[in-house]
Amino acid sequence: MTTAEAVDLVIWGPYFTKINKIIGETAGVVRGENFALGIQSLNIKTLGGYPWNESDRMPEFDIFRQGNDQNMHPETDGSVLYRIEAAKPTGQGSSLQAYCRNRFKERIVEDFDHDRLIAPAYDDGGVTGSKIAIFGCPVDLSLETIGMIELTEGLPHPLIDGKWAKTSAQANAAYLITAFTEETVDHAIALTKKAGLKYLYHYGKTFENWGHFDLYKGEFPNGIEGLKKCVEKAEAQGIKMGTHCLSNFISPNDPYVTPIPDLRLAKVGSSVITGDLDATATEIPIESPDFFNQMKNNHLKTVMIGDELIRYSSVSKETPWRLMDCQRGAFGTFVSQHKAGTIISKLLDHGYKVFLTEADLTIEMSRKLAELYNETGLRQISFDGLEGNRSTGLGTYGESLMPYTWFNELSADLKDHLIIDASRTTHFFWHIYTRMNWGEPWYAGFRESQTEYRFNNQAYFKRNFMPGMLGWFRMTSETTIEDIEWMLAKSAGYEAGYALVADMESIAQNGFSEKILQQIGDWEQLRLSNSFNDGQKLKMRNNSKEFSIQRVGEGSWNWSEVFSYKFVHTQKFRQPGEPLFSTFNLDNPCREQIMQFMITASNCDIHLVSLEIDNYKTIQLPVALKAGQILRYTGSVEVELYSSTGQLQETLPVDPKDFLLREGAHSIQFDCVFDKAEKESEVKFEVRLTGEIEVVRHNGS
């Protein structure tokens, strides 16, 4: 092409097909009963997708739910992991598409909740060199064919123990996330091993700043050498170590910001000042307010003029346009005088109170991060906030730019065993990353946090040849064995990994920690060895069902469904003589068995607990529960009283025969005396019954 500068776009396709059984929108592969067609971008500047948006940001929604394959801009449905890119459904089948944009000229786009945002000029050769691969093959060779294309075309092809990450059973291995220091790393390694896991992920304050990635002295006082020794200790015990990265987010304390701000900090746009500024001015006259008065995503309200950063509260409502109530020399920069006509730029920021990067600075930061990995031997990374790299003006191209540069700078040894995850992907980034994963399990209970989001995304992963992941789960001092096994069963059912976030203090405080860690290791062994059959996996994918395993010998476990009946007994105020008990109905689905149960005093104290089974057998439990305490019975000759954090506090003898239930329907009348109770006081009563037992053997045994 001799006049590449005159060509704005090269569009590959759309290539329409009649195939519609499985459409991998991100991977760019559509599959029918026997035959698959695919498209692959062969370099980073060739984007999977179509220029639906001038910003090169691909639509993010579940197009399969929407039902309208023509509307690429619907209202968001919360399915943020979905990206309509290289493949999409059509009314008659599907289409494959890719494109490349000429970026020699500055453009104005919409992004980051800004109606006007400068996309800087970027010289990557323009559309010259854009290329794709189109392939067709039997369905069962689809993934293998992509792997061959990667190797033939020199695309990223990361490995795990020498095997392509996309086909490695270890690609979605579970891992422990915890805070540790040079002093406490041995304990963190021991906990990882106790849980039967092989990956330990640092999640304290790893870095003093984001940008230069200087290690935090409070946790790594010996800097690079200190972290390297932590990695070596873990490696010696078969544990790989990784950490968290907020991608191109730059903290205000970073040398890219202070004391002299880097000119490559991302900008919303620029104007000029219309009058001289002395060192005391708190109002700044500007020629145009266009890039300064967009407040939807304006978290730091910072402008750059020369080497000075200035924060402002607002823009005047009328001419002459002024930035109001300015704080001079923000973030430790130097207050200076400025002449009329000097360029003033609004810096682009993020809700995490950080600045972002232009493309050249993204590349430099990526190399710094790769240098850290090469020097320390870290082998796992999570690129959190990759969407921040759209600050480059490159859209999804920018999202791939940081991990692509980072990966290319890594040593050959690291590339031989590497796990790369992120909370999002793009068509090209698919080649680099190992798996999708995401965090923020903080706002709800173990079973409620992002539940629908976790499970709905599994179909997206499967149709795009991605290892399944369920995201992060947070273990607290009050997490129960039942909660953990609920999650572990979903992990096994979906063949999906997860991250367990657990600080050392919570693990130490939780009285069930030993059992929890053992169960994690046992379930993970069985999952990674593909020991569960398809029928068991299907059952475990049911969100409303619970399952448990019990080790019965070397390499073998009893697996069964657990039928959990959860009831609430509330304090009642009635006429004298009127019953105050609650009646609960349940069904024992299989054999005669001893019922197991838990009684939790939610927000009150109780005593004189009684259970009347089937209107003839009354069992008095001579125990008093304080608010938060839990009475557990697991079928033995004792009932156990625990604190809210699982610390055993008392045991009482019982006769197991009293709790024997035949197969079929039953009723239980629950009663107690409330102490120190409010009007809304309640007691939680859960009965647990075991279904048919199946023996599961470790495939490696």
What is the meaning of each model-derived region?
Residues 1-200, 233, 240-241, 379-380, ...:
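Carbohydrate-recognition beta-sandwich/jelly-roll modules
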Residues 139-160, 193-202, 226-269, 339-341, ...:
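Glycine-rich, aromatic-flanked loop segments that form ligand/cofactor-binding clefts
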Residues 252, 256-271, 347-364, 409-510:
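Glycan-recognition surfaces
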Residues 6-18, 292-307, 333-352:
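Extended Gly/Ser/Thr-rich low-complexity repeat segments
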Residues 227-251, 264-271, 426, 490, ...:
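Carbohydrate-binding surfaces of carbohydrate-active enzymes
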Residues 169-170, 174-271, 347-370, 374-400:
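Aromatic-lined carbohydrate-binding/catalytic grooves of carbohydrate-active enzymes
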